[in-house]
């Protein structure tokens, strides 16, 4: 049986649909409808986990503080690093065999230039959030070496899907309201992963015997521009959009004037990953194409 943290979050709520038997860690302040739950007040370096592991073979650790929550640098460290290490150490004591840690592609950096990020790329966490995830990875590898805990690390690219937060949620709302977008001249190259594909991968990482000890850079394996990506969102929503040919220089100027420079760079920058080792190690390929994944937007659109 699996123990899933972050069960009420965006990815966790979708993961629960792919699992037959699991126990879900839920913060006491959150309501949920899961049959088997373990409640905690918070996740940090002193969280008590003594009653969480009965019958548990593997953990999928999704819970954490994201950059959109805007905590202090210590807030990231307290939850994302110290909380992860505490959970892993307590899991080892209870005899749990495997720990799947959902990290971030931000561990590798903000963008790619000549070639995609790969397992050979030097980590370059660019902010406190990414650093906290990277430090957690280092701590987990140390625990694995010392105890034999089977650690699997997954670094997803931007995760999209129904009710996704962040830039994807913003783009979806924009497309619903306005049939005109400014990405007509965009030729950048970015990798993404749908929440359907990511959750399927996480289940595989928790159960496949070959996954232990590996790090995976997770994507749909479909590299697209922001123009192509927003066209795919529109198609998934059953909408039609017109892409205005706005030069990047003008978009960057608009970003500076509105305080949205970082968002503009995220939308127009390149971020490619080499996900080939997932197929090589696990024999796994994404079950959904981007078009198929985007179709779920219309099914859940209200």
Language-model segments: residues:
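Catalytic helix-loop patch of NAD(P)-dependent Rossmann-fold dehydrogenases
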Residues: 78, 113-160, 180
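Substrate-positioning beta->alpha
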Residues: 164-170, 183-206, 213-214
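C-terminal amphipathic/interface module of NAD(P)-dependent oxidoreductases
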Residues: 262-302
């Amino acid at each position: 049986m699996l123990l899933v943290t972050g069960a009420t979050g965006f990815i966790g709520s979708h993961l629960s649909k792919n699992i037959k038997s699991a126990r879900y860690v839920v913060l006491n302040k959150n309501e949920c409808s899961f049959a088997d739950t373990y409640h905690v007040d918070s996740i940090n370096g002193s969280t008590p986990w003594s009653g969480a592991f009965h019958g548990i073979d593997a953990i999928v650790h999704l819970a954490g503080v994201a950059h959109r929550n805007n905590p202090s640098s210590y807030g990231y460290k307290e939850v994302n690093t110290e909380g992860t290490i505490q959970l892993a150490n307590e899991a080892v004591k209870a005899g749990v065999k495997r720990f799947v840690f959902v990290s971030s592609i931000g561990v590798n950096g903000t963008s790619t230039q000549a070639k995609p990020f790969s397992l050979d790329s030097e980590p370059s966490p660019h902010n406190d959030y990414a650093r906290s995830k990277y430090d957690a990875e280092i701590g987990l590898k140390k625990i694995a070496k010392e105890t034999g805990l089977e650690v699997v690390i997954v670094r997803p690219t931007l995760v999209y899907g129904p009710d996704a937060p962040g830039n994807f949620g913003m783009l979806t709302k924009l497309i619903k309201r306005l049939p005109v977008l400014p990405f007509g001249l965009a030729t950048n190259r970015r990798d993404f992963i749908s929440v359907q594909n990511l959750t399927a991968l996480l289940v595989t990482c928790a159960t496949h015997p070959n996954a232990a000890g590996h790090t995976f850079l997770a994507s749909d394996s479909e590299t697209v521009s922001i123009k192509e990506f927003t066209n795919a969102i529109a198609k998934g929503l059953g909408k039609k959009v017109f892409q205005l040919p706005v030069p990047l220089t003008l978009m960057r100027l608009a970003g500076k004037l509105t305080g949205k420079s970082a968002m503009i760079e995220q939308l127009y920058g390149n971020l490619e990953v080499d996900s080939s080792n997932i197929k090589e190690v696990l024999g796994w390929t994404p079950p959904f194409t981007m078009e198929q994944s985007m179709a779920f937007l219309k099914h859940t659109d209200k």
